[in-house]
Amino acid sequence: MNNILSFEINEIRNILQGWGEPSYRADQIFDWIYKKLVLNPLDMTNLSKTLRQKLLEYFSFQIPKVVRITGDGNTKKYLLELEDGENIETVLISHKNRNTVCVSVQVGCPIGCKFCATGLIGLKRNLETHEIIGQLMVIQEDLEKKEEKISNVVYMGMGEPLANYDNVIKSIRIIKEEWGFNIGSKHITLSTIGIIPKIYQLAEENLKIRLAISLHASNNELRSKIIPINKEYPIEELLESAFYYAEKTGRRVTFEYVLIKNFNDRREDAKELVRLLKGKPAHVNLIPWNKVREYPWETSDLKDIFRFKEILANSGINVTLRISYGSKIKAGCGQLRALYLKNKGETI
């Protein structure tokens, strides 16, 4: 059965017209779903009983099931169960009047970065559009209790967004549009390890969302050690695609850089990063590595983190240090899989 959360409004209009219904019924249906959070068509009282019954028979209105919620201050991690029994994790960060949702796009991840917990799962499957949108529905329902709304969406959860391109792009359109979640492009960020052909394709979509590149090293030798796909998509070509995206969209690109002790946090690493990015439409987001016990790495010392940041800032690079919200509940960068394995009965 088709899940209605996978459809854009024009697709629903076409289906309704085939049923002999006026196209404005689609607007009413989506108002119930995205504005009133009503997922039972029988409760859509401005529709005829016949149409309500037809919607119930033709579409699924299912969203992921909440298995467990863990909280740490302003961060909540949701373990969700999909219809086939697979699990994903979604994170809500509430900070300074913002509610940012970090969505997953795959069950597991195919990239296998050598510092990230999600990659240890491997790839189970891609998420469908409705499974991405369903994560937002779950969290918006939770926020409604406080009369709050989702303000930002980041594609930084489990999986590589550009490896599930079609479903991710469709979900972005649903999030952006007024009939959907009505969240503006500048409040949507897609983070990618750097699948270069898809970055060029994304630039042509005219979505104008924010792009974040998971760089994590300033030269190919180091990056290839922790990001296997770098051998296929080396740094120089990756930067070229990123700056093409910036030129096409008018948005500077964020480069995420996880700091790992005595690996990529040295003075020379910072200076090499300056040479790559100086004078470019770039912003660097430094992220202290969050411990994953299967890997031998350690988090950089604070003095080295601040030295790295200072070298970039003094060289004219826009740089911020990300506070790792949620690391205590394993909801921080690179940690999404602990609840997944626990729910599957595996050792973590």
UniProtKB/Swiss-Prot annotation:
Residues at the active site: E89 (proton acceptor), C333 (s-methylcysteine intermediate)
UniProt cross-references to Pfam families, sorted A to Z: Radical_SAM, RlmN_N
Cysteines joined through disulfide linkages: C102-C333
One GO location term (cellular component): cytoplasm
GO MF, any single term: 4 iron, 4 sulfur cluster binding
UniProt-annotated binding residues for [4Fe-4S] cluster: C109, C113, C116
Keywords for the protein's UniProt record, in alphabetical order: 4Fe-4S, Cytoplasm, Disulfide bond, Iron, Iron-sulfur, Metal-binding, Methyltransferase, rRNA processing, S-adenosyl-L-methionine, Transferase, tRNA processing
Enzyme Commission designation: 2.1.1.192
Main localization, broad class: cytoplasm
Cytoplasm in keyword set: yes
First-level EC class: transferase
Family, similarity comment: Belongs to the radical SAM superfamily. RlmN family.
General function of this protein: Specifically methylates position 2 of adenine 2503 in 23S rRNA and position 2 of adenine 37 in tRNAs.
Name of the featured protein: Probable dual-specificity RNA methyltransferase RlmN
Organism whose genome encodes this protein: Dictyoglomus turgidum (strain DSM 6724 / Z-1310)
Gene: rlmN
